[in-house]
């Protein structure tokens, strides 16, 4: 079973779209939390990650960071392991 992916995002974020495309190539759909539409969820993201930028991505219970970190996991081959593919 594929790991749950949660992505804090905004509608106009290009890095969010890039992360979504990378996950789509893997056949994985992220559950998106739109922080531009819900300030309480933005506060939650900052509390959980210590970061204010988007995307912020969780795979299972692990905070992996943003798009650059996600792409780095793909380059090293670790993304499939985390996604349980």
Model-predicted regions and their roles:
Residues 15, 44, 56, 66-69:
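Residue-level recognition of specific faces of alpha-helices
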Residues 31, 53-54, 81:
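A local structural micro-motif
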Residues 59-85:
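Non-catalytic, surface beta->alpha helical segment in thiol-disulfide oxidoreductase systems
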Residues 1, 42-46:
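Short secondary-structure transition/capping segments
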Residues 28-41:
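Thiol-based oxidoreductase modules, predominantly thioredoxin-like and allied folds used
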Residues 47-53:
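Thiol/disulfide oxidoreductase modules built on the thioredoxin-like
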Residues 1-29:
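Local sequence-structure signature of Cys/Sec-based thiol-disulfide redox active-site neighborhoods
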């Amino acid at each position: 079973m594929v790991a749950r992916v949660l992505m804090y995002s905004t509608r106009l974020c290009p890095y969010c779209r890039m992360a979504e495309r990378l996950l789509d190539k893997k056949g994985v759909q992220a559950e998106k939390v739109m922080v531009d539409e819900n300030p309480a969820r933005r506060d939650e993201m900052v509390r959980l990650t210590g970061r204010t930028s988007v995307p912020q991505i969780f795979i299972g219970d692990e905070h992996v960071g943003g798009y650059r970190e996600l792409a780095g996991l793909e380059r090293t081959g670790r993304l499939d392991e985390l996604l349980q593919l």
